[in-house]
């Protein structure tokens, strides 16, 4: 699917599986290869992941995704980051949410059979809670004038992984802004032609401000 949407991107010619240290990387891309560290995909209940030392690096809200079904998701995310590197959360909240939302939309196109919660890195309960709270989340961001915030702290609080959201409580994941960004993209895409919905290169190039203005997003 990546080659279909990004035909000019040279896919890795070799896939290398290995078992490395528990604090090592789970996926990396070289000049012509992709390396996958299986030690990072043993299943979230693996005894290896329960040690205090391991949880210093990867607390449960991260290791909940260390299961075999996340191998293709992690690989696709890394390939996408190689194709279109994202910023470091410095352009303001709404722009960063939409840029991350673009990548979630693309991820779903690349891996259409993967569960939506898994693509976000949320548990099933977190995803359901976020879906149910979407309108309240958006209204809060508007009410508190956070949508256009350029404060890097606010951006990080809403887009970085965490066990829960400091704004929306224990049931909502820390990076809830990624979900909102994806919903804005989905709202915008509903107004595009079928051909444009599959033009992922054009999506990446489309200014976030233009997408937001045209999305008419209102959950």
Task: Please report, for each region that a protein language model flagged, where it lies by residue.
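Acidic/His-rich structured neighborhood in mature extracellular/periplasmic domains
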Residues: 1-127, 197, 201, 205-208
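A cross-kingdom marker for long, charged
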Residues: 94-219
